[in-house]
A protein has these predicted regions:
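Cleavable N-terminal export/targeting peptides
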Residues: 1-32
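Outer-membrane beta-barrel biogenesis signature
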Residues: 21-42, 50, 130-144
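Transmembrane beta-barrel architecture of outer-membrane proteins
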Residues: 22, 38, 66-74, 115-119, ...
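Short secondary-structure capping/turn segments at boundaries of alpha-helices and beta-strands
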Residues: 27-31, 58-62, 72-78
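Short coil-to-beta-strand
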Residues: 39-41, 88-92, 146-152
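Surface-exposed strand-loop-strand hairpins of Gram-negative outer-membrane beta-barrel proteins
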Residues: 48-70, 107-108, 161-166
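Glycine- and aromatic-enriched membrane insertion/assembly motifs of diderm outer-membrane
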Residues: 64-100, 188-215
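Outer-membrane pore/translocation modules
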Residues: 96-210
C-alpha cells in the first residue's frame, strides 16, 4: 500500500508541475487597453511551499511536501488590428521544483530545475477598446470591454521521461477565453474601480514520451 501511495502521488505531480511552470498571471488590469506600439516588459518571482498533491490545493497530505520557485519573464506589445487593440504576449519561466513523500519507513524526494515551456498569447478586442495613439489614449474613458483571448503553450521546457518532476510538459496546450471588463463609476486615475471576469478553457495535447513510472 505504501508503494502504491507513492506511485499515485508521483503520477499526480508529473501532471501538476508542468502546468504550474507554464502558468501566466491573469491578474487585475492585465487586459486593459493601452496606446498602440506600447512595449511592456514584466518580471515576476513566484514561490510556493505546501503539502497539497493537486494544483487547486484541495487535497492536503501530511506525508507530502512541495516547493516551487519560479522566475517569470513576460513581454507584451500592443498593435492596431483593423481599428481594434490587440495585445501579443510571450512568457518564459525558469526555476526549480521539488517534492518529498514521507512514510514511516523512508522518504522519497524528486526535483527538477531549468526552463519551463514557452507561452504565446494574443488578445484581440471585440468592442470597447479601440486602437489608440498615445494622444488619443490620454482622452480615453474605458467603459465595457470584451476581448477574445487565444494562447498556446509550446513544448520547449526541460523534460526527461525518466524524471518524476519536469519543468516542461512535452506537449502542446491551447487556451481560449473572453476577458470582460466593466468600469464602475468615473474613470479617474487613482480612483478607478472595475469589474473583471475571465472565463477561459484549456485544451491539452498528447505527450508521446510520457513513459516514466510505466505510464503511457
Amino acid at each position: 500500500m505504501k508503494i502504491q501511495f507513492k506511485k499515485i502521488v508521483w503520477r499526480t505531480l508529473i501532471v501538476m508541475f508542468p502546468i504550474v511552470a507554464s502558468a501566466i498571471d491573469d491578474g487585475p488590469r492585465m487586459y486593459w487597453n493601452g496606446p498602440v506600439d506600447t512595449n511592456i516588459l514584466q518580471t515576476y518571482y513566484w514561490t510556493v511551499h505546501g503539502n497539497n498533491v493537486t494544483p487547486e490545493g484541495t487535497q492536503p497530505n501530511n506525508n507530502f511536501e512541495t516547493d516551487i520557485s519560479l522566475g517569470i519573464l513576460a513581454y507584451n506589445r500592443i498593435f492596431d488590428l483593423a481599428g481594434h487593440a490587440m495585445i501579443l504576449t510571450g512568457v518564459m519561466t525558469a526555476g526549480n521544483i521539488s517534492g518529498t513523500i514521507s512514510t514511516p519507513i523512508n522518504s522519497t524526494a524528486r526535483s527538477s530545475r531549468g526552463l519551463g515551456d514557452l507561452y504565446l498569447q494574443g488578445v484581440v478586442n471585440l468592442f470597447g477598446a479601440p486602437a489608440l495613439s498615445a494622444e488619443e489614449f490620454a482622452r480615453y474613458k474605458q467603459g465595457a470591454v470584451l476581448s477574445l483571448l487565444v494562447g498556446v503553450t509550446a513544448p520547449t521546457g526541460d523534460y526527461e521521461n525518466s524524471r518524476a518532476l519536469n519543468m516542461g510538459a512535452n506537449r502542446w496546450n491551447a487556451r481560449i477565453g473572453l476577458p470582460f471588463m466593466q468600469t464602475l463609476g468615473d474613470w479617474i486615475p487613482g480612483e478607478i474601480t472595475t469589474l473583471e471576469i475571465l472565463p477561459s478553457v484549456w485544451f491539452y495535447g498528447n505527450n508521446d514520451d510520457y513513459t516514466s513510472l510505466g505510464l503511457n
